[in-house]
Amino acid sequence: MKIAEIQLFQHDLPVVNGPYRIASGDVWSLTTTIVKIIAEDGTIGWGETCPVGPTYAEAHAGGALAALEVLASGLAGAEALPLPLHTRMDSLLCGHNYAKSALDIAVHDLWGKRLGVPVHELLGGALTDSVSSYYSLGVMEPDEAARQALEKQREGYSRLQVKLGARPIEIDIEAIRKVWEAVRGTGIALAADGNRGWTTRDALRFSRECPDIPFVMEQPCNSFEDLEAIRPLCHHALYMDEDGTSLNTVITAAATSLVDGFGMKVSRIGGLQHMRAFRDFCAARNLPHTCDDAWGGDIVSAACTHIASTVLPRLMEGAWLAQPYVAEHYDAENGVRIEGGRIRVPQGPGLGLTIDPERFGPPLFSA
């Protein structure tokens, strides 16, 4: 089956109860980029990519649209299958995984619909009918972080990510301590996420002053080299997030025992095809990981849920979705929802969504 047409859209996603605060800045509203692939037989596949602003990573909404215009212009008539698609995309544009991810998701959605099976079957098959999610507490005052931590634990979340950084390290230490005091004894897991916001000095101080708190340190510093520097001196397990930009980087980090796990985003690694390889590599190395994305609506949330359902449960650290911060669903009936800290795995064909073809207005680009 070949691609007949690709249409590109953009859509605003205001942050519910904003801002969402991380070390790189405050987020009030984001622009998501939507891909619609139409096959020769009229089957439609949807994809999506939504960077968290221009400073979180080397990605932004304007760049996504520009890259997708280049890719879409060269994909008419191409095979609508993941491997041929990636081969063709790589011949058209170097890098830009976050843009390629949207096309990858759309092709998986298209083929699932064509075959009448959910995307998770194309990825090897679901191991569960619901996936654990985790809640991310933005950078906030320590007392408020503790209050929200207990609230989310009572809602059913089994893991909390505490956003830290871009302020005195003493406040971050106070925040993680108060969060731990609030949820201690509940069995909830904690991740202290610096989002690249700490110096190596502050990351080491944070770990040394909290040896009694069982958290993992997620991407505390800015670079691969920073992680190498602090690794032998840390008192806590170390996870890679933003630096995990490719399969090659992941393989190197695991082979050198640099990290104990990963926070991985579908868009960062280039889509479900590459995420599947990442999943299998982590299973071979017995490394836990998440299945997330930076931001977005139902389309990218469904993609994350499908791949998360195929991960060995003992290695699955949860799927983070922006859904609690997004006011609307693209599909009011089948939109992805977090309930009791878990996400039901969609069972309909493709991503399991039924989206009105006119939902996002006229396309900004078509090829």
Swiss-Prot record:
Which residues are recorded as binding Mg(2+)?
A: D193, E218, D241
- Enzyme class, first EC level, given as a word: isomerase
Pfam families annotated for this entry? MR_MLE_C, MR_MLE_N
Q: Does the keyword DNA damage apply?
A: no
Q: What is its EC number?
A: 5.1.1.22
- Cofactors required: Mg(2+)
Catalytic activity reads: trans-4-hydroxy-L-proline betaine = cis-4-hydroxy-D-proline betaine; L-proline betaine = D-proline betaine
What are the catalytic residues?
Answer: K163, K265
| Details of cofactor binding | Binds 1 Mg(2+) ion per subunit.
Database matches in InterPro entries: 4R-hPro_betaine_2-epimerase (IPR034622), DgoD-like (IPR034593), Enolase-like_C_sf (IPR036849), Enolase-like_N (IPR029017), Enolase_C-like (IPR029065), Mandelate_racemase_C (IPR013342), Mandelate_racemase_N_dom (IPR013341)
Q: Which GO terms describe its molecular function?
A: amino-acid racemase activity; magnesium ion binding; racemase and epimerase activity, acting on amino acids and derivatives
Q: What SMART domains does the annotation carry?
A: MR_MLE
Keyword terms of this UniProt record: Isomerase, Magnesium, Metal-binding
Q: Which residues bind substrate?
A: Y56, Q161, A294
Q: Name one GO biological process term.
A: amino-acid betaine catabolic process
Q: Report whether Ligase shows up as a keyword of the record.
A: no
Q: Highest taxon of the source? A: Bacteria
Per the record, the similarity remark reads: Belongs to the mandelate racemase/muconate lactonizing enzyme family.
Describe its function: Catalyzes the 2-epimerization of trans-4-hydroxy-L-proline betaine (tHyp-B) to cis-4-hydroxy-D-proline betaine (cHyp-B). Is involved in a catabolic pathway that degrades tHyp-B to alpha-ketoglutarate. This pathway would permit the utilization of tHyp-B as a carbon and nitrogen source in the absence of osmotic stress, since tHyp-B functions as an osmolyte and is not catabolized when it is needed as osmoprotectant. To a lesser extent, can also catalyze the racemization of L-proline betaine.
What name goes with this protein?
4-hydroxyproline betaine 2-epimerase
